[in-house]
Amino acid sequence: MDSNTVSSFQDILLRMSKMQLGSSSEDLNGMITQFESLKLYRDSLGEAVMRMGDLHLLQNRNGKWREQLGQKFEEIRWLIEEVRHRLKTTENSFEQITFMQALQLLFEVEQEIRTFSFQLI
């Protein structure tokens, strides 16, 4: 995994955890949880690509990995829409910068997952 992506995930998660969005903090915690889950999923796909022999293990262990991949893309699209919505509604520059970086990271991760999945298919 690219060390810039690791630091980006860590930076975004740290920044989001510092935000105080009042009644929507529960939603923000959900976004943070999904970001963490997405990072773990991306990492596991990347590792499987690095060890192509793991493809058979991955397929045997989880016969529904393509379905799972589709669900991850749905999660990414939901997160993108949620981040865009937050970006439009916030006037705080710290939050705007954080959400812009989160949006950029989501696009990068979506592309990386697509690349990994094509290599696995």
Curated annotation (Swiss-Prot):
Signal peptide: none annotated. The keyword Transport applies. SUPFAM superfamilies: Nonstructural protein ns2, Nep, M1-binding domain (SSF101156). InterPro entries: Flu_NS2 (IPR000968). It is found in: Virion; Host nucleus. It holds the Pfam family Flu_NS2. Keywords: Host nucleus, Host-virus interaction, Transport, Virion. The keyword Transport applies. One of its GO terms (biological process) is exit of virus from host cell nucleus through nuclear pore. A motif (Nuclear export signal) lies at residues 12-21, 85-94. GO terms for cellular component: host cell nucleus; virion component. Interacts with protein M1. May interact with host nucleoporin RAB/HRB and exportin XPO1/CRM1. Belongs to the influenza viruses NEP family. Average number present in a viral particle is estimated to be 130-200 molecules. Mediates the nuclear export of encapsidated genomic RNAs (ribonucleoproteins, RNPs). Acts as an adapter between viral RNPs complexes and the nuclear export machinery of the cell. Possesses no intrinsic RNA-binding activity, but includes a C-terminal M1-binding domain. This domain is believed to allow recognition of RNPs bound to the protein M1. This is Nuclear export protein. The lineage of its organism: Viruses, Riboviria, Orthornavirae, Negarnaviricota, Polyploviricotina.
